[in-house]
Amino acid sequence: PVPGIPRLRGMATPWMCHRRAQCRMAVASTEASFATSGINYGLFCSTPSVPLVRNLPIKQAMEMLLTGDFIDAQTAQAQGLVNRVVAAPSLDAELDKLVTAILQKPQTAVRMGKAMLYRQREMGLEAAYQLAGQTMALNMMDADAQEGAQAFAEKRLPAWRDPS
């Protein structure tokens, strides 16, 4: 249930930028850079524009797509294209840390949460809140959610039944 989390050490030009934007999470080295540079050669990066406008604020996506300029990893993180930026030697360890953090959570909640996030994204506000309420109600019936509430009340760490 862990989302695909790519890592990027170097340059992500249109195709790689497209692939990174499609992922729900990403980790990059401080040396990484991103561009949709097709416009520099007379070709608007139409395909990369689809995930970019779904993952970046429209103004940042528009600037990347219309200028073809590179952005560095820190800018990509500030704009929401990557989650974390670390020095290249720490890239694998940081990715492992992120994956481990997700795997240590109750996997039923992770699966339900991911499914709800994907579905609600294309819904109107009211429908999204309805789905969120339904998901929360179903999630609260799960033994791990009940264990989490009990652990919170007892001021202890939860003992998940289904850790990865």
Predicted segments, located by residue:
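Crotonase-fold acyl-CoA enzyme core
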Residues: P1-V110, D142, Q146-Q150, R156
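A short acidic, helix-capping loop that chelates divalent metal ions and anchors anionic groups
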Residues: G38, R119-E122
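Helix-loop "lid/cap" segments that line or gate small-molecule binding pockets
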Residues: M64-L65, M116-R119, Q134-M140
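Short, glycine/charged-rich beta-strand-loop motifs at protein surfaces that mediate ligand recognition
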Residues: V99-T100, R121-M123, A137
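Short beta-strand->loop
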Residues: G124-Y129
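Short C-terminal tail/terminal secondary-structure segment
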Residues: L157-S164
